[in-house]
């Protein structure tokens, strides 16, 4: 564990502190407070280094809770213009890759947030070379059984239809309907049934429970969660991440830094 930082180039630390002070000066932060923050907080220091082009990407977390890390990050790093910040997890099993969101940030997303998350997931899926097929998940499938808890998912579908997006989507549906081809006979009207590779969860708790159960009980390879929508190439490692998990996150952060124009 790193308890303190040793700055090998003190002038660079002054530059990063100056950058962060300019960002936070109208949010109640004095210059000496920001200088102390850069010296003592690895997230503030690392993200400011990336913003000042003194680093390309960053992986943080691992020894603190994910929520604590994301809250610190959101104070010093903005989201990408027009995007929400959320967690997306990749799961690879039987030669198929599935993207699941939001697994880590928003407890109970609104219909509009589900729409925004789905569009960001599609952007990421295309970066990874996938043809996105988006399923909005629920405990019901196309209105059966009826429940007020599924209405925000159904509303998200209607909102997305109005936007005339360039990807296939459908819902609401249960996960087995989204993933298993046997259900195509029951729902021949849907292009997504049995073909989904992007799963939009109705809430964070259902997403987190699902992917952690799969990670613990199956042979599926789980990568992430990846932090999507942040204005810099930064990933947060969950508590007690393994060496291979850290390497995966570092590779994805580096890839993001290379292919995404964060200055837009």
Stretches found by the model and what they are:
Residues 1-264:
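Anion-binding alpha/beta catalytic cores of soluble intermediary-metabolism enzymes, centered on
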């Amino acid at each position: 564990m790193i308890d303190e930082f040793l700055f090998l180039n003190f002038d660079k630390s002054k530059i990063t502190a100056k950058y962060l002070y300019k960002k936070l000066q109208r949010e109640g932060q004095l210059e000496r407070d920001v200088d102390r923050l850069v010296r003592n907080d690895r997230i503030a220091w690392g993200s400011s280094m990336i913003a000042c082009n003194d680093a390309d990407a960053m992986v943080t977390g691992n020894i603190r809770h994910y929520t604590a890390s994301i809250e610190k990050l959101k104070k010093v790093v903005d989201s990408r213009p027009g995007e929400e910040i959320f967690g997306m997890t990749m799961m690879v099993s039987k030669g198929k890759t599935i993207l699941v969101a939001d697994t880590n940030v928003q407890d109970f997303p609104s219909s509009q947030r589900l729409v925004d998350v789905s569009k960001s997931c599609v952007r990421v899926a295309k970066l990874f070379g996938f043809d996105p097929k988006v399923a909005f998940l629920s405990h019901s499938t196309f209105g059966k059984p009826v429940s007020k808890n599924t209405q925000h998912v159904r509303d998200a579908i209607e909102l997305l239809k109005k936007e005339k997006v360039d990807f296939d989507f459908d819902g609401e549906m249960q996960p087995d309907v989204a993933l298993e081809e046997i259900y195509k006979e029951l729902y021949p009207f849907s292009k997504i049934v049995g073909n989904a590779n992007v799963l939009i969860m109705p809430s964070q708790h259902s997403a987190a429970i699902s992917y952690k159960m799969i990670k613990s009980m199956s042979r599926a390879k789980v990568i992430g969660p990846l932090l999507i929508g942040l204005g810099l190439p930064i990933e947060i490692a969950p508590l007690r991440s393994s060496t291979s998990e850290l390497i995966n996150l570092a590779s994805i952060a580096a890839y993001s830094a290379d292919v995404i124009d964060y200055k837009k």
